[in-house]
Amino acid sequence: RRQRQMCIRDRRYVVPSAPGKRFPKDTKVTDMLYACYESAANGEDFSEQLDNIHARYQEIIDGLNLDFSLDLDFVQIKENFSNKAGADYAASRGECLNGKIMAAYLGFEFVDAAEVVRFNDDGSFNDEVTNTLLSERLQDCKTAVIPGFYGAKKDGTIVTFSRGGSDITGSLVALAVQADLYENWTDVSGFLIADPRIVKNPKSIETITYKELRELSYMGASVLHAVSYTHLRAHET
């Protein structure tokens, strides 16, 4: 509830990822979607797998006491899986559905990333067109939720960034709207001075330069996707 009030009061654009693990041995929704896609692609019955994913989202909806349903979305997803939708489409549903829930919860407009994040026909990312689409779409949009991790080609084919790509989407939105501040909320408490799996209770880094941020990201720090640096540095957000 506190996070909701913070978003409504101070934040204009929110870019969510797919639901992660609820506990250590849990499975991330993205991995569940990939597994469901594999079953569908192999001609196997994937109904139970998709129902389990639906249940995960319903748990979130119920926990937020929302009068909101994803039933029709899952009907469409099942149909698309049956019609051999690609792996990128399957994986992207994690962010898309989570974005719809968050938009309903915050009272923000939902903007599908497929409409504003553009990939070329060869699957490469189109930075220039994306910036134009985002700028034009959001200029008259006071608040919005834009799901991370994916976009689409001009023909509507869904394409994803690499894992952790919601950070990239967030940086693209920040650049497009010339944001004064970009925040990256995650389950990790900032950048740490050492690997917490090796060093017990390492201190966090309070201030970091763009160069240090890039180096830590490329070295494997999972707080921020390495590619996000490029867009943030361009605007010095």
Model-derived regions, located:
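Nucleotide/pyrophosphate-binding catalytic subdomain
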Residues: 1-5, 9-231
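A short, hydrophobic C-terminal helix/tail in secreted or cell-surface proteins
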Residues: 231-237
